[in-house]
């Protein structure tokens, strides 16, 4: 597993979980630092070869390269301006996540974790963000994916309607508020405004329901939380 996150000053951190090894690549004084299972490896000790697993970590140009071809990872590279992930040929079609299946197919590349396809690249990218379990954990993003209600009423099939997104939208956890947002276009399923159906019933299986219209919604990209969250 390769995971990427931004810290509170928008610097990128990469975490690689491969075999039983945990590798962290992170910004350090204008360069890239590296930790293996929580222990920092000094630059003068690179290249590093793991004693039991075929993993090599070395300096490459202005960044750090992690190579483990026997485990499916051709290279993970990171420097202060860029990052990339490459898998070996025999992993093509077996991957998932932000980079897709790596099989060259382009018509179904925007498949979200729930199995549904989206037409929107931003919605697709957001769908692969790991939801936080607690708003008190500073190492997590403090956001979750949720269906949202369209703020305005819409007229659908001649009826005033309430509409709910069939695609998940990033939202801050309870007790937190957004400090950075972006606009995304998502599909909405609508029910008559005077319907007796309550919100929980509408949201049950919402991601498989028909799309009645597409509208913009605010996605929360960064959140600040109260001490009592």
Swiss-Prot record:
Pfam families: VWD. Residues 1-136 form the VWFD domain. It comes from the Eukaryota. GO terms for molecular function: lipid transporter activity; nutrient reservoir activity. One of its GO terms (biological process) is cellular response to estrogen stimulus. Keywords: Glycoprotein, Storage protein. Glycans are attached at residue 198. Expressed in liver, ovary and, to a lesser extent, in muscle, intestine, skin, kidney and heart. PANTHER family: VITELLOGENIN-RELATED. Precursor of the egg-yolk proteins that are sources of nutrients during early development of oviparous organisms. This is Vitellogenin. It comes from Takifugu pardalis (Panther puffer).
